[in-house]
Amino acid sequence: MATKAKPAAASKKLCAEELIREFESAQQKTDLPEIYVGDTVRVGVRISEGNRERVQPYEGVVISKRHGGMNQTITVRRIFQGIGVERVFMVHSPQVANIKVERRGKVRRAKLFYLRERVGKATRVKQRFDR
């Protein structure tokens, strides 16, 4: 019984996957804290105005985490002048200067989309002290 040789396309694909994996690992940030849904975080966003660049903080509750690796995103929600504002940040993006966890939240859901319907004190998340 003769064994079949691997097609050349499959080995090329494997090499391409390895190249992509190496490139992504070089681009990933290593100084990020552990971020959980329910945490209150402060994200430093790089903003370029003309020829100047500054870092603008954006603070809010993490209501969602998606994907993993290079494509990991977090959705941060805050209340600004009585209106809920959500921003989605790619964690490993060069536009994100830093992420700091201000306080840990104690929640029992993976996604906190129910906070969108809540108003005022009902949007508060209990604090967790053990992490």
UniProtKB/Swiss-Prot annotation:
GO molecular function, one term: structural constituent of ribosome
Protein name: Large ribosomal subunit protein bL19
Protein origin, superkingdom: Bacteria
Keyword Ion transport listed: no
InterPro entries, sorted: Ribosomal_bL19, Ribosomal_bL19_CS, Ribosomal_bL19_sf, Translation_prot_SH3-like_sf
Keyword Ribonucleoprotein part of the UniProt annotation: yes
Organism of provenance: Synechococcus sp. (strain CC9902)
Keyword annotations from UniProtKB, A to Z: Ribonucleoprotein, Ribosomal protein
Pfam short name (any one): Ribosomal_L19
Family under the similarity heading: Belongs to the bacterial ribosomal protein bL19 family.
One record GO biological process: translation
Record's GO cellular component terms: cytosolic large ribosomal subunit
Main function: This protein is located at the 30S-50S ribosomal subunit interface and may play a role in the structure and function of the aminoacyl-tRNA binding site.
Disulfide-linked positions: none
